[in-house]
Structure formats: C-alpha cells, structure tokens
C-alpha cells in the first residue's frame, strides 16, 4: 500500500486536489510502486520563494521543490520506502497553465509527477536525463487523459 499525504497551505481551497490525488495513485500503479510514502504540500509563491532561498540559496520563486528523505537514516518506517516532500506553488500552477495554454488540472498533475520522479531519483541535469524524465511525465499525463 502507498501513502501520500496532501497538505493545502495555500490561501484558498485548491479544487484540483482530488484530481491530483487520483493522478498520483495512477502514477504509482503505472510506475509499479509499492509501499512508498511521501507528502505533497501546496503553497503560494511567497512560501516557495522562502524555501528556495533558505534551502537552495536561490532568491526567487519556483514551481516545485522536492526534499528527498529516502537516504536519511533517521527516518525509518518499517515496511515503507519514505521518499520525502514535494512543495508545489499553486500561484505558479495558475500562471504556468495560462502561459502554456492548458488547464490548471494538467499543470498541477505535471508538477506533482515531476516532484515524484525527482524523489525517485530522476533528474534533468543532462539532455539525456531530461529526455528520459520529461518523456515519462508526458507519457503518464497522456495515458491518464491529458493532451
């Protein structure tokens, strides 16, 4: 069994949260993940800016930040693979959906799976890694029903 906790720390209700939960569970199934646990925290631009500055020394907002915990030996839950936390800026969900010409539903699911893949060890630092990671994201979104 997989466990994902969703925390809405945004200033308003996030109507796409149930869809994101369903999509993450879909991704678990397609990626054949079992017994994993992680958190998704929805925040605003101000909050993610502070996190980005404090932990990455980058003085600007971003769309998604992940904190991998799997290698942290102090976090041990028997029978579970504890992956970490995914922070998503809902302000960026809104602005990027508009910029890219698609729905906020697609954008929040994109950022959710992007964060999950980072926690699983995927990255996009090289062109080869970027093609692999973004290809997998695109495939999951497409098969779920996003065009």
Language-model regions, residue ranges each:
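Periplasmic solute-binding protein
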Residues: 117
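An acidic/histidine-cluster motif and surrounding catalytic segment
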Residues: 1-109, 120-147
């Amino acid at each position: 069994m997989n466990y994902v906790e969703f925390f809405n720390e945004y200033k308003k209700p996030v109507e796409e949260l149930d869809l994101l939960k369903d999509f993450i569970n879909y991704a678990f199934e397609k990626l054949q993940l079992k017994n994993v646990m992680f958190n998704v925290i929805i925040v605003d631009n101000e909050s993610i800016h502070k996190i980005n500055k404090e932990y990455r020394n980058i003085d600007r907002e971003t769309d998604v930040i992940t904190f991998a915990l799997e290698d942290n030996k102090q976090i041990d839950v028997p029978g579970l693979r504890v992956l970490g936390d995914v922070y998503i800026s809902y302000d960026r969900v809104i602005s990027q959906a508009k910029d890219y010409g698609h729905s906020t539903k697609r954008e929040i699911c994109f950022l959710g799976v992007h964060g999950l893949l980072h926690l699983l060890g995927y990255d996009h630092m090289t062109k080869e890694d970027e093609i692999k990671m973004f290809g997998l994201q695109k495939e999951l979104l497409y098969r779920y029903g996003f065009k």
